[in-house]
């Protein structure tokens, strides 16, 4: 058998055997649409509600605050477009020039319809420095989106430092 190394785990990764086993009943037998009112949907709806409650408890949130998406791209779209279209009076978004394409494309889409976006430059090591963010941010900034660990070059950002500056200006 040929041996190989799969090096694109940032995009998709092998499913954990325990997760696979846990999903078999839902994929094979209990696949009703949890959003529908018919009887075949009761078990999936209950399982999703229970999963939402477990996750909420783990992160000290309310279950109503937990949303499941199909993956990172959909989540990025929700966060960026939802923030831009919110009625808060704060509509500017800040991201970096080295973000994942899902973030960059969502930011570009909001720019095309008039929402301001600023793109932070990275230093020679791929870092987004807090002092750089401090120069770009304003009280109109609603969202700052910086990838924690860059999917191409691996740089790990100072998220705590960036978050402190963002929160000081009322941004997420």
Segments from the language model and where they lie:
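Pyridoxal 5′-phosphate
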Residues: 1-172
């Amino acid at each position: 058998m040929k041996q190989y190394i799969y090096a694109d785990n940032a995009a998709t990764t092998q499913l954990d055997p325990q997760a696979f086993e846990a999903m078999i009943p839902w994929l094979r037998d209990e696949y009703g649409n949890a959003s529908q009112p018919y009887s075949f949907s009761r078990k999936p709806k209950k399982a999703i509600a229970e999963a939402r409650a477990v996750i909420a408890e783990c992160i000290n949130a309310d279950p109503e605050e937990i949303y499941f998406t199909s993956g990172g791209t959909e989540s990025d779209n929700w966060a960026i477009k939802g923030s831009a279209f919110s009625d808060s009076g704060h509509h500017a978004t800040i991201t970096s020039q080295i973000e994942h394409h899902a973030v960059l494309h969502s930011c570009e889409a909001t720019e095309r319809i008039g929402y301001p976006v600023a793109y932070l430059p990275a230093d020679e090591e791929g870092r987004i420095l807090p002092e750089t963010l401090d120069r770009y941010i304003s009280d109109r900034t609603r969202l700052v989106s910086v990838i924690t660990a860059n999917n191409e070059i691996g740089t790990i950002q100072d998220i705590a430092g960036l978050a402190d500056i963002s929160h000081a200006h009322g941004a997420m």
